């Protein structure tokens, strides 16, 4: 994505993360090391740190409300990647999947990293058997 972002001079296909540490920081760092820009959409909470140092300064945004932050994540998304995480990650993931399933959001590539984690957390087969998830909702499964 950063290569495409560089080709458009940072106008399209820009890496966007939650601006925090860990995997989010790695995404911003990768964009910076490639000479690109990246967006950080941070949430203002008493226990949260400041945005990571690799977010492009002019593209660092602080949100007080989760709903508005999620809206900004999803309205421009060309792909969604989700790594193992807690309740915040689950909330963002299921909101995005619901919006895609109900046609409120354009269908985009949706990639879950860490198959073993997701298979333990979500019983995909049980959802399909209960007709709550359809095979048309799922794409290729890769390890």
Task: Enumerate the language-model features and the residues they cover.
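Glycine-rich oxoanion-binding loops at beta->alpha junctions
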Residues: 46-75
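Glycine-rich, charge-decorated loop segments at or immediately adjacent to ligand/cofactor-binding or catalytic sites
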Residues: 26, 118-129
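Short, acidic/small-residue loops that bind anionic groups at enzyme active sites
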Residues: 35-48, 83, 97-121
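Single conserved hydrophobic/aromatic residue that forms the stacking wall/gate
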Residues: 134-143
